[in-house]
Amino acid sequence: MSFEINWQDLGEDEAVNDSIKSFLNSHLQSISLPSYVSSLQVTDFCLGGIPPNITLREISDPLDEFYNHIEKEELPKDKIPEESDSGCQSADGENGDLLPEVQAESDLQFLVEVDYKGDMRIGVSAELALNYPSPSFMTLPVKLSITDLGIHALCLVAYISKQLFVSFLCDVADPILDARESLIDLGSSAILGKKSLERISLIRSIKIDSEIGEQNNVEGSVLRSVGKLEQFLLEVFRTILKKEAAWPSWINLDFNEDPSGNESSDED
């Protein structure tokens, strides 16, 4: 079974694009930049008009972890059970799950296969710092365009009490993306290379094009720094997506009357 998504409306929604741009910038501000970069900011984000292909693989009851998350959100802070030395949650000295007393009939969980090779675009601005003969001796503006994002993975989508949970589980074999994962473009763009030994990479393919300011005065050391910046961005965006959306983390969308916004939860 396949799904059709009105992706065009999402891609043209400025609020959605601005929200994702703000989300990415908040993460960029929280990371330590390498010495050759003095600033880094997402200046533009467009979801694009090409939707992912989504195939339904299984329908089941939602996982206990999602119910536990909802109950912990609803409990007062002084009532949240502490974790025992073994890592399991306990209440009144006993281990146990925080399952709801009543599970609604409308609660559902879908295991879906997500295949995305769309036209999403991310614009990034940065300043390369030349640290010789002194730190930040000179800075050079750089504009980067991120395109050709490729994802093919299994994903859990759970609906509980007007809340939506989305978590990616593992990569799926893909002839196109598997071929791209073994490539590195040494020209003006970079392709994410080296197959990950982990169960999930999520971002299997990504391309970055760079535009350097004052190109007539560019030195070899600057060009090398641009290449390092491109590779740094590849790892940053892959890490952000894995940290926020790959199991045991998830994206939580609350559609109740008093929504708390987009949240992600880490469950160790």
From Swiss-Prot:
Topology versus the membrane: Peripheral membrane protein
Cell compartments where the protein resides: Mitochondrion outer membrane; Endoplasmic reticulum membrane
GO cellular component: endoplasmic reticulum membrane; ERMES complex
Alphabetically ordered keywords of this record: Endoplasmic reticulum, Lipid transport, Lipid-binding, Membrane, Mitochondrion, Mitochondrion outer membrane, Transport
Database matches in InterPro entries: Mdm12 (IPR027532), MMM1_dom (IPR019411), SMP_LBD (IPR031468)
One record GO biological process: phospholipid transport
Residues annotated as domain SMP-LTD: 1-256
Chain segments carrying region Disordered: 75-94
Pfam families membership: MMM1
GO MF entries: lipid binding
Free-text note regarding domains: The SMP-LTD domain is a barrel-like domain that can bind various types of glycerophospholipids in its interior and mediate their transfer between two adjacent bilayers.
Protein family (similarity comment): Belongs to the MDM12 family.
Task performed by this protein: Component of the ERMES/MDM complex, which serves as a molecular tether to connect the endoplasmic reticulum (ER) and mitochondria. Components of this complex are involved in the control of mitochondrial shape and protein biogenesis, and function in nonvesicular lipid trafficking between the ER and mitochondria. MDM12 is required for the interaction of the ER-resident membrane protein MMM1 and the outer mitochondrial membrane-resident beta-barrel protein MDM10.
Subunit comment: Component of the ER-mitochondria encounter structure (ERMES) or MDM complex, composed of MMM1, MDM10, MDM12 and MDM34. A MMM1 homodimer associates with one molecule of MDM12 on each side in a pairwise head-to-tail manner, and the SMP-LTD domains of MMM1 and MDM12 generate a continuous hydrophobic tunnel for phospholipid trafficking.
Name of the protein in question: Mitochondrial distribution and morphology protein 12
Lineage, uppermost ranks: Eukaryota, Fungi, Dikarya, Ascomycota, Saccharomycotina
UniProt gene name: MDM12
